[in-house]
From Swiss-Prot:
Protein family per UniProt: Belongs to the peptidase T1A family.
Pfam families on file: Proteasome (PF00227), Proteasome_A_N (PF10584)
Gene encoding the protein: psma7-b
Primary subcellular site in the record, as a coarse category: cytoplasm
One Gene Ontology cellular component annotation held by this UniProt entry: cytoplasm
Name of the protein: Proteasome subunit alpha type-7-B
Domain of life, source organism: Eukaryota
Record organism: Xenopus laevis (African clawed frog)
Subunit structure, as described in the record: The 26S proteasome consists of a 20S proteasome core and two 19S regulatory subunits. The 20S proteasome core is composed of 28 subunits that are arranged in four stacked rings, resulting in a barrel-shaped structure. The two end rings are each formed by seven alpha subunits, and the two central rings are each formed by seven beta subunits. The catalytic chamber with the active sites is on the inside of the barrel.
GO terms classed as biological process: proteasome-mediated ubiquitin-dependent protein catabolic process
The entry's keywords: Cytoplasm, Nucleus, Phosphoprotein, Proteasome
Maturation and modification: Phosphorylated in G2 phase.
């Protein structure tokens, strides 16, 4: 029997191959990074170069689900569109029913459940996306969650998905500290530094979105990103000079 063709059948050694193939599709996607600060949540994604005549605004990897929640994804854009639309409808339905916005965990659990159903149904295939979902609950607590094609989800302080996830995660494990997220600017810089581990062409290929407590989602413009990149480069040079003086 061909176990890699059947979605709902386990192989003898316990694998669901279609789910594993979906996870491989995620690893080929653009890198996305999320960091939860003290008063801010930040998502950054690696922008792939677009065709000369293509409108850049139509190529978005970060999108709002509700006023207090937004997400970034890695993997198949068409699959992400379905998940995003379903999640937005659920956010609206929740608001109409209970007259309150969703919590970040609620909508993450909804997305994870949707993905899980597609690993157990005939005539369907798993969604080839992982998502970083961030936002604030009504009490002002910042949240960051990650879901994968199998339907699992976990809360994180900082995480990365996509093709450069391994090296970015190693960077975050090394550099994420309470001091590194002490201010909003430091949190934003941490995300940019993490992305610069895999993005070769500097700030022009980075897309960044921030949400502060009780404030709407803000997409940073290229000039703001370049300013942060310039500050990071300056700090690097100063640190190198200090090292040289010590030696």
């Amino acid at each position: 029997m061909s176990y890699d063709r059947a979605i709902t059948v386990f192989s003898p050694d316990g694998h669901l191959f279609q789910v594993e193939y979906a996870q491989e599709a995620v690893k080929k996607g653009s890198t996305a990074v999320g960091v939860r600060g003290k008063e801010i949540v930040v998502l950054g994604v690696e922008k792939k170069s677009v065709a000369k005549l293509q409108d850049e605004r139509t190529v978005r990897k970060i999108c709002a689900l509700d006023e207090n929640v937004f997400m970034a994804f890695a993997g198949l854009t068409a699959d992400a569109r379905i998940v995003i639309n379903r999640a937005r409808v659920e956010c609206q339905s929740h608001r109409l029913t209970v007259e309150d916005p969703v919590t970040v965990e609620y909508i993450t659990r909804y997305i994870a459940s949707l993905k899980q159903r597609y690993t157990q149904s005939n005539g369907r295939r798993p969604f080839g996306i992982s998502a970083l979902i961030v936002g604030f609950d009504f009490d002002g607590t910042p949240r960051l969650y990650q879901t994968d094609p199998s339907g699992t989800y976990h809360a994180w302080k900082a995480n990365a998905i996509g093709r450069g996830a391994k090296s970015v995660r190693e960077f975050l494990e090394k550099h994420y500290t309470d001091e590194a997220i002490e201010t909003d600017d430091l949190t934003i810089k941490l995300v940019i530094k993490a992305l610069l581990e895999v993005v070769q062409s500097g700030g022009k290929n980075i897309e960044l979105a921030v949400m502060r407590r009780d404030q709407p989602l803000k997409i940073l413009n290229p000039e703001e990103i370049e300013r942060y990149v310039a500050e990071i480069e300056k700090e690097k040079e100063e640190n190198e000079k200090k090292k040289q003086k010590k030696t």
